[in-house]
Structures are given as C-alpha cells and as structure tokens.
Design a protein with these regions (language model features):
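A surface-exposed beta-strand-loop module
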Residues: 24-32, 72, 81, 91, ...
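Early extracytoplasmic/domain-onset interaction patches
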Residues: 27-104
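Hydrophobic alpha-helical and helix-loop surface patches within well-folded domains
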Residues: 32-53, 67, 319, 351-648
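Short, hydrophobic/aromatic-enriched beta-strand segments in well-ordered soluble domains
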Residues: 86-88, 92, 105-107, 180-194, ...
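Solvent-exposed beta-hairpin/edge-strand motifs
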Residues: 102-156, 260-261, 685-696, 713
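Glycine/proline-rich low-complexity spacer/linker segments in large multi-domain proteins
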Residues: 113-128, 189-251, 272, 727-749
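Hydrophobic helix-coil surface modules that form long, contiguous segments used
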Residues: 222-233, 239-431, 460
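Beta-strand-rich binding/interaction modules
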Residues: 264-265, 565-566, 581-701, 705-710, ...
Length: 749
C-alpha cells in the first residue's frame, strides 16, 4: 500500500512543521531565491521560425547557399610565392535577391596595411633576440596580402569590386534572384609567409640543414562568405582569432609544384598514376586493403633522396572534392607518406600521414593509427565519416584543420628520442585536428562568431577518443577538475562561453576547456550516457552539411532527451558563475515519546485549531536541552507504542516485513556559495566502512538557491558525508564538502 513508501519519512513531520513555523518571521531576510536560475531561455534564444524550428531542427524553409570552385594554382618554391586563378559559381538559394556578393580575403590579415596588428595592445619587451628585435623595429613589415589582378564575369568583362581589409564586395551587373547562378573569375598572387617566424595557420617551414621547405597552404584563394537567415552576409573582418564561416561547394583544383614534391590535399586525387612512381602506386593499393596497420607508401629513403634534388621540372596534382566548405594543401620534397584503410559503419576512408624524417620514429609509429582511431571514435558519437580520407601533416608548432587535412606539431629530438609529454602532445593534437572534420567541416557552424561551437564540441569528443585510445591518456580537456583553476579565477578576467571569438581573453579555457567540461558533466552526471548520446547524435545528424547556431544545439539536446537544460545553458554558457556546494551543518535526531519544550508549546497552539490531533512521534535533536544520553542507546523503531500501533493497524504482515527500520536520523543543510545551480551528489560512509550514494537533481535549488535541507534515515550510524566525492561537478572549493570537516593537506605538507 502507498503508506509503505511514506511512513517513515513522516517521522520528521512535526520537527519540520515546527521549524518552518519558527523561521517564518525571518524567511524574507535569510532566503535568497533567484528565480532566474531556472528561468526558461525565451529571453535569450532567437524566436523559432520556418528556417529554424523550436525543436532545434532545420525548418521547412531552411536554405543555404552553394559556392563551387575551379582553381588553378602554382607554387614558386624558390621565391615562396603562390599564383592562382579561380572561377566561382555561386548559387542563390535564398528567397531574396542579392545586389552584391562578399568574398573573403583572409590572407589580407598579413597585408602590410592590415589593421590586425593595430588592434592589439603591446609593451616594450625587456629582452629580444637579434632576429626578433630586427623584425619588430628594423625591418619592413612582411607583405603577405592578396594581390588581386582582376575580377571578371563569365564573358570576360571586368567587374567592379571594393576591398575592405579582409573582405571584398563584388557588385553585380543585375540582381541575383532566388534560384539563379552567377560565375565569375579572380586572378591573384601573394607572398607565402614563414609561419615559424610570422605565425599563422598557413605558410612554410624552412629546414636549414638541407635547404628545403615544407608548405602548409590554406586561406590561399578568395573564398565566398556565408549568406544565411541569421546574419545575412557574415562579413565580419578576420582579425586573427575568430576563424571561418564558409558555404559548402564542390571543388576542382589543379596544383602545380616542383616535380620532386610529394603533395596531399582536400578531396580525391584524380591523377595518382601521373604523380606517384609505379612502386609508390603499388604500395598505395596495398594500403587501401590494410585495415590493421599503416603501409609506407613513400619511404624515408625516397624522401631523403628527393631532399637533394631541387628539380626545376613541374608536376600538376589534380583534385576533386564534393560538398566541402574549404580546401587545404601540403607539399614538400621531404615528405614520407603512409596510409591505411579505416571502416566507420557503412563507409571506408583512408587514414594518411605525411611527415619529414625529423618526425620519425614518432610519426611512423603513431600518427596514422591515431587518425584511424579518431575516425572510429567520433563516428560512433555522430555519423559515419562521409569523406574519402583524413590526412595528418607534421608541421612544426602547428595545430590547424581543413576538410580532410590538418597540420600537427610534435617531433622527437635530433637523436630520435622523445618524452611521454611529446608523444601524448602529438597524439592529442592529431586527434583534435582530425576531429574537426566533424565539427566544423561537416556540422558547419560559424567559427567567426562562436568558437566554442566547433572547438568545444570537438574537445569533448577528443576527450572521449583519447581515453578510449589509452585509458591512461593525460587528457587536459573534459574532466571537471581540470577546469576549476579557470572557473575559480578572477571574474574580471573571464567572459561567458557565449562571447564573440574576438572578445575572449583566455581563449583555450573559454572556447575549448569549459564547453568540453560542460558536455562531459551533462553526459556523466546530469543526463547519463544513453540520453546524452542519443541527443548529441541527433544534433550531429540534423545539422550534418548544414549551418547550425547555438540555439539549434541547445534546443536539440533538450528536444531529443526530454531533459530541461535551460538552467544549465544559462549558468554554464551565459555567465561566468562557478560551482561551490558545501555542507553547512549536520544535525542528528532521535525518536522520542516526549516532545521538546518548544515543540510542546507549538503543539498546544496547533491543537487549539485541530482537536483531532492524535498521538505523535517526536524527534529530538542531539545537543538540544531536551536531549537525553539514553536516547543514543540501541533501540528498535517498533519499541515506540505509537509506531507499533500505527503499523499494526495499517499494514499487512507481508507489508510489515518490507518496512525499513531506521535507527539514526540526520538532517543535512547544504549551502551554495557559488552562483551555479548544480546537482548535489552525496556519498555517505557508515561507521562500518560501507558507503551509500545519493543524487539530488539541480532543481532542488529552485525554491532557494542558497540553502536546502535533506534528511537521511539510516540503519547504521554515519561516520562521514562527502559532497561530490568523484569531483565530477567542477566544485571549486572542496574544503566545505565534508562532514565532519576535514583539513585538506597543503601541497607544501
């Protein structure tokens, strides 16, 4: 019967009623209720519409533009220049007409007249190397911006354009209506920067010993800006931090380089037999059938022989890529090349690595294996990897991603020795950058606006991939305890996750670490694996090859799980609040036939209003003036006549056998010095060493977000109560997490 479930909890009725009445007069002064903690997100979310629905899915009128490219480029290795021509075919799928187009010229961030250096605060450094002093104060600034030679329409007629730093507006001869296409051509060139000196996501690395260069080429062509239902034209300038917003399209790219170079790029290589030797071609075909280990396609001996040649002949590598948002290239004489096949669900792709001999033995041993593992792991949480390959390029000090290709740091010393830190650093960056194929290359969010939408989600999946690759992987992003130093820092130096990319001061913690931690807490602590994984996979599949916004993610996670997470998004993503939940006090109570003096007075008043009040059971607090030492002796709950009579009158023998018989009663007051509302996770340790765990959802704070009480009726005496015993909620102060209070050892002890 229903009474079974509620009977013993009613033991606290009188005490609780009395306490509430006693404190009624001071509630207004002590209770700090902030209803905004659980307020629904209508005030912050965009209104759902026919483009983006309230469920977080694309709406029936959702659209996105298409930009197709035919590109021919040539690399001048002697002078480090790149020359190119392209034809862009742009399709307007918006149900509105366009008067002009915006094209991104991100390379202009390195132009001599770039405004990017002018928006950074700087001071005089106390010490310089000769090279750094010369570059800062003596030499003319490097000019790495685009040199646009022409913009022409499909008939060869010059089109009018205006360049504003990293954006170029092309004026159309007539409006581009819904469903119409326009083709136009651009010719350009630029100086390739030495990124090891100038920094940046693209450029070349020079090897003094053999005189060769290793190129990682990106942002190398004028690229269409995004036009959508949220921003209109996303033509925010590229200042260097906020990365890219790009439409999907199809690419045909011909790349001419010295004949002795080995090259890889986005897309399918169409003329492999023309650029590989017969032996290399044979090895590559073996790699296509090797699912358990990489096959060396271009050997170290072949790479070392090419390093000495400096051929003046040329070769053109021809690529085709479908439904990608961008294109990246890497080329060098120095490259060793290995590959293996990897199956993800119903698709098979090639995992590929290119690296100079300076990367061995580390790269030959690990790179392609971690590429393959990453594809399998990420696909299990999202969708089968849809592209034909994923490439890891070894480039000094790099960590950058493009569709199907990425550049990654990590090399042993000159003697081929490396530490665990070097090894795991390399494995981590490869996993992370390969993972970007999913976010944002396929789930194509606006990086220029919201860095966390790709970096945060990717860092979360990276964490899952790393610990499945090696359970002892020293992963940095994901575990809740790792974000505590950031979240507990000076609030004046923090911004909410929902902050534009160019306004974030602690970029790594804000856009990578904190959102990754938030998602890990959702999965491990708040939603559970089953609900979280289904919702996350729903988001990935809804927005695969589309352009999601933050609201689309937030709404989908709730829509697919039936878990109200508005309180979580508001606290973790829209504020810099931190979590700090502690135990304020613990009071032990004992069953008594006699009320305390205060309760007796309370009951007299109550009985004046309720003459039918029958015999009662009373709870006496240990330490109160009514407490008697004999109350602490062993007893049976049914020794008390009121309880024994009640049970005999209301329960069958079968039901009585199922009743609990608690001997100890505790009231625990939890307080919350931190601003975040979070679940209360409690571990109780009994005097016999056994433990019991309790989980109270975050909604426990909805009526009072400063203090809440929970009661525990136990058969055994409690020796210790611990909040967040596994450190899974990013609680910044664990000194208030224990009862009895424990003194945490200093790192100096």
């Amino acid at each position: 019967m229903k009474l079974t479930a509620t009977f013993f909890s009613s033991l606290f009725f009188i005490t609780v009623s009395f306490t509430q009445a006693q404190e009624a007069t001071k509630t207004a002064k002590t209770e700090e209720r902030n209803p905004d903690k659980f307020k629904q997100m209508y005030d912050l979310f965009a209104t759902p519409n026919m483009y983006r629905t309230a469920s977080g899915a694309p709406g029936p009128e959702y659209y996105q533009q298409q930009a197709d490219y035919k590109i021919d480029i040539e690399l001048d290795d002697k002078n480090q220049k790149l020359y190119g021509t392209e034809t862009i075919t742009y399709t307007n799928n918006a149900k509105e007409s366009l008067d002009y187009l915006w094209v991104q010229l991100d390379q202009n961030e390195k132009a001599r007249n770039s405004n990017s250096p002018l928006v950074e605060s700087n001071k005089i450094d106390p010490v310089f190397s000769g090279q750094s002093f010369s570059r800062k104060y003596l030499e003319e600034d490097f000019d790495g911006g685009f040199k646009i030679e022409y913009v022409k329409d499909s008939q060869g007629k010059v089109m009018k354009y205006t360049v504003n730093q990293t954006m170029m507006r092309i004026e159309l001869p007539e409006v581009l209506k819904f469903g119409e296409k326009i083709s136009f051509s651009i010719k350009w060139w630029y100086n390739i920067n030495n990124y090891t000196i100038d920094g940046g996501r693209s450029g070349y690395e020079h090897f003094e010993k053999d005189g060769n260069n290793l190129y990682v080429i990106a942002q190398f062509y004028p690229r269409m800006a995004v036009y959508n239902d949220v921003e209109g034209w996303q033509n925010m300038q590229f200042w260097g931090s906020g990365e890219f917003a790009l439409p999907f399209g199809n690419f045909e790219v011909n790349i001419t380089v010295p004949a002795d170079h080995i090259l890889e790029a986005t897309g399918t290589l169409l003329n492999r037999s023309e650029v590989f030797t017969p032996e290399q071609l044979k090895r590559y075909k073996l790699a296509e059938q090797s699912f358990d280990k990489p096959v060396i396609v271009v050997t170290q001996a072949e790479a070392e022989a090419r390093e000495k040649g400096f051929s003046t002949a040329k070769k053109t590598w021809k690529f085709k890529a479908e439904n990608v948002r961008d294109f990246g290239i890497s080329t060098s004489r120095k490259f060793i090349y290995d590959a293996m096949a990897v199956k993800t669900g119903n698709t098979t792709a090639m995992a590929i690595s290119l690296y100079p001999k300076e990367g061995n033995p580390l790269w030959e041993e690990y790179s392609t294996r971690i590429v393959a593992h990453t594809l399998k792991s990420y696909s299990s949480f999202t969708f089968d990897y849809p592209y034909p390959k994923a490439i890891s390029i070894n480039a000094r000090d790099q960590g950058m991603e493009y569709p199907m290709i990425c550049w990654n740091f990590g090399r042993p010393d000159e003697n081929g020795k490396y530490t665990d830190q070097t090894k795991y650093g390399m494995l981590g960056v490869i996993c992370h950058e390969i993972g970007h194929n999913y976010f944002p290359m396929i789930v194509n969010s606006d990086e220029r606006q919201w860095t966390w939408m790709d970096e945060g989600l990717n860092s979360f999946l990276e964490y899952l991939a790393e610990i499945s690759f090696d359970p002892n992987f020293p992963t940095r992003k994901g575990p809740a305890k790792n974000i505590i130093p950031y979240m507990s820092g000076d609030q004046k130096g923090l911004e909410p996750i929902m902050t534009n990319s160019e306004s974030i001061r602690q970029f790594g913690n804000n856009a990578y670490g904190k959102p990754a931690t938030a998602l890990n807490i959702l999965r491990e602590t708040i939603m559970g694996h089953e609900l979280f994984d289904y919702a996350f996979k729903t988001y990935a599949n809804r927005w695969k090859f589309k352009h999601p916004t933050p609201e689309d993610f937030f709404r989908t996670m709730e829509d697919a799980s039936a878990v109200d997470l508005d309180w979580f998004w508001r606290g973790w993503f829209y504020t810099t609040d931190y979590n700090d939940i502690g135990i304020k006090e613990v009071n032990k109570y004992f069953v008594s036939n006699e009320p305390s003096k205060e309760v007796a007075d309370f009951l007299k008043k109550r009985r004046r209003r309720d003459s039918k009040q029958g015999p009662m059971v009373y709870m006496i607090a240990e330490g109160s003036e009514d407490f008697k030492p004999e109350m602490n002796k062993p007893f049976k709950i049914f020794d008390y006549k009121v309880l024994d009579d009640f049970v005999n009158q209301n329960f069958s023998e079968e039901e009585k056998n199922k009743l609990n018989e608690p001997k100890f009663f505790y009231q625990v007051t939890f307080n919350k010095p931190g601003g975040l509302v979070m679940p209360i996770i409690v571990e109780i340790t009994f005097e016999d060493g056994t433990t019991e765990n309790h989980y109270f959802p975050a909604q426990i704070w909805r009526m009072n977000d400063q203090e809440v009480n929970r009661t525990f009726a136990t058969k055994k005496a409690i020796a210790k109560i611990q909040v967040d015993p596994k450190l899974e909620t990013a609680d910044i102060d664990t000194t208030n997490n224990s009862w009895p209070k424990t003194i945490e050892k200093s790192k100096f002890d």
